[in-house]
Amino acid sequence: MHQILRTSFVLAAFAAPLAAQTPNANCSGRSTATQDACEKATDLFSFIMPQLGTSLAGGSHTLGLGSTLGGLGHFAIAARINAIRGDVPALGSLNVGAQGRSSSNIETNSQFLGLPAVDFALGIFKGLPLGITRIGGVDLIGSASYMPEVATDDVTLTPADGGLKIGLGARVGLLEQSLLVPGVSFSYLVRDLPVTSLAASAGNADFAISDFSLKTTSWRLAAQKNLLLFQFAAGYGQDTYTSEAEIDIDITSPVPVSFATSVGQEMKRTTMYGSFGLNLLIAKIVAEVGQVSGGEVATYNAFAEAANKSRLYGSVGVRVSF
């Protein structure tokens, strides 16, 4: 996770608003010495941010759950690790020119990128009876994400307010799970990474990023069925990623120059997943796999894989519920 965070912050340091497969209009207004840095960073930022968004928001809202809990007195908590099969740009081999923009073939390294998380859900209303099931049940749902302070030889990452961020949302039961009926629900959740500042050096540039934020909103239509020792769940939904940052940058060579800018991106992606769980008394061990796809990202530079490539992700964890 540190690798993708570090990469995304480095890339954001040069970034400007995204253009569509042509030179970035906002970069065109810059000096010749900063045009190439602007174009490359815009593309790199746009390439990495969807992966970071998926590592935060991908998959089920509560690991292995597709039904409401059954009203007051019921709760669930799950500790999980999310991982996405991603591609990280190779910054060490990337050169920024000073003679105007130049389209490059940017190398990437394939690797799994992970983020730990804690999900929680609290029953609020058990719903209205309908035959052998109930409808209209309501749960409060949420998640907790934590970003530690990081200090290495070439990067210092400082999260604001202790680095802990709580996301909140709600789940509404369309059908409550019973002996014969699967549980079906709709949920909506807002999840953010903690606001972060970064100071770093990369290649021929030094930079400082302040007020970096990544906000996600997502909805899920999910179903769940327990069969003795086993549980099965599946879901479909959409994620929206919104990122912003303020940056200052000093290019040290071949022509020393400084500039400042704001950077931001918004993207919507479709997600679908399935999970399998093993019931062990009060604890459930759950494994989940899914795929995220869609969204539009245009780049001036070339990558081995498209920035909006469909990507596999997975989660594994333990859930306790009553």
What does each model-found stretch correspond to?
Residues L179-K268, Y273:
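Detector for outer-membrane/organellar transmembrane beta-barrel domains
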Residues F75-A79, F120, L140-A144, A170, ...:
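Membrane-embedded beta-strand positions of outer-membrane beta-barrel proteins
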